[in-house]
Amino acid sequence: MAATDFVGEIRSVGERLLLKLQQLPQAEPVELVAFSIIVLFTATVLVLGLIACSCCCAHCCCSESRQRKIPVRPTKPR
């Protein structure tokens, strides 16, 4: 039952978003700015998540061996 409730909730959110998009041309400037900020924030989070995942996967899945690091020893004072 939890799965059907979740699907119903997602469908409800999608319908409200579609209704909001359809009413956007008649919206007030404040609503346009608020909606634009929300969309911009959501897109930014998704893009940053995609970049983080791609960087993580590139380092984890990459089979190339990195160059061996040589430790640096301090020099003796003269």
Curated annotation (Swiss-Prot):
Name its species.
Answer: Mus musculus (Mouse)
Alphabetically sorted, this entry's keywords are: Membrane, Transmembrane, Transmembrane helix
UniProt keyword Membrane present: yes
Question: What is its subcellular localisation?
Answer: Membrane
PANTHER family reported for this sequence: SMALL INTEGRAL MEMBRANE PROTEIN 5 (PTHR37344:SF1)
InterPro entries reported for this sequence: SMIM5, SMIM5/18/22
What stretches pass through the bilayer? 32-52
A Gene Ontology CC term for this entry?
A: membrane
Topology in membrane: Single-pass membrane protein
- The UniProt record lists the keyword tRNA processing: no
What lineage is on file?
A: Eukaryota, Metazoa, Chordata, Craniata, Vertebrata
This protein's name: Small integral membrane protein 5
